[in-house]
Amino acid sequence: MNKALSVENLGFYYQAENFLFQQLNFDLNKGDILAVLGQNGCGKSTLLDLLLGIHRPIQGKIEVYQSIGFVPQFFSSPFAYSVLDIVLMGRSTHINTFAKPKSHDYQVAMQALDYLNLTHLAKREFTSLSGGQRQLILIARAIASECKLILLDEPTSALDLANQDIVLSLLIDLAQSQNMTVVFTTHQPNQVVAIANKTLLLNKQNFKFGETRNILTSENLTALFHLPMFEQQAQYKESFFTHFVPLYKTLLK
């Protein structure tokens, strides 16, 4: 089976009958990268919670065909965990309750760090790291869980441009080299253009899902963000690419 995830007629609300979204449908195959794009408060994080089973659908159903790993937008702890401790948390589903990690678990955790070229940070205290390093460590934790479907909640929101590029490149590599299915939330259209082959636009109870090249248009983005969005073609060396530019009201003054 090539299918990774199926969402059928999904409906959910926090307050009775005030649906956050309704009759939401989409399917993903193994190796797909789905960007969930929308304004703050549109339900992006709630959708991830539903996929994780934290919330139960009010309507419809969700079928997950792969093991799930999750990378939260923020992670904090009152304890002085080392980087290796954090990555080992990804092994929790493979370790019996109250049992200590085995040598194989340490090996898998170090392999996850090695995959990201971060083994030199293994003994560092997690809270001493930069925002970009912390985000990569949380991705390493998900990789150590040996998941095949990784969900990321705005993984670049606190990162500078250089670290955003590192994370986005990593997600492409996970999909292409590991055949991992990737779902990430964002409110940045140009990140969607850069890496996602599938896009889900969430706009209150309205949604659009499909191939990114068909969904990500100036018309759809303008309706989504209530701000004029212009599509532009650019060139870097011999490569041509599309990006979107917002027309901020302050520019018209």
UniProtKB/Swiss-Prot annotation:
Localization, UniProt: Cell inner membrane
Traced from the root, the source organism's taxonomic lineage reads: Bacteria, Pseudomonadati, Pseudomonadota, Gammaproteobacteria, Pasteurellales
Annotated GO molecular function terms are:
ABC-type molybdate transporter activity; ATP binding; ATP hydrolysis activity; ATPase-coupled transmembrane transporter activity
The name under which this protein is listed is: Molybdate import ATP-binding protein MolC
Q: Which UniProt keywords apply?
A: ATP-binding, Cell inner membrane, Cell membrane, Ion transport, Membrane, Molybdenum, Nucleotide-binding, Translocase, Transport
| EC number, as in UniProt | 7.3.2.5
Organism name: Haemophilus influenzae (strain ATCC 51907 / DSM 11121 / KW20 / Rd)
Q: Show the InterPro entries listed in the entry.
A: AAA+_ATPase, ABC_transporter-like_ATP-bd, ABC_transporter-like_CS, Metal_Ion_Import_ABC, P-loop_NTPase
Q: What is its main location?
A: membrane
Membrane topology, as annotated, equals: Peripheral membrane protein
Function of the molecule? Part of the ABC transporter complex MolBCA involved in molybdate import. Responsible for energy coupling to the transport system. Functions as a low-affinity molybdate transporter.
The catalytic activity, as recorded, is: molybdate(out) + ATP + H2O = molybdate(in) + ADP + phosphate + H(+)
| Activity regulation information from UniProt | The MolBCA complex shows a decrease in affinity in the presence of increasing concentrations of substrate and nucleotide.
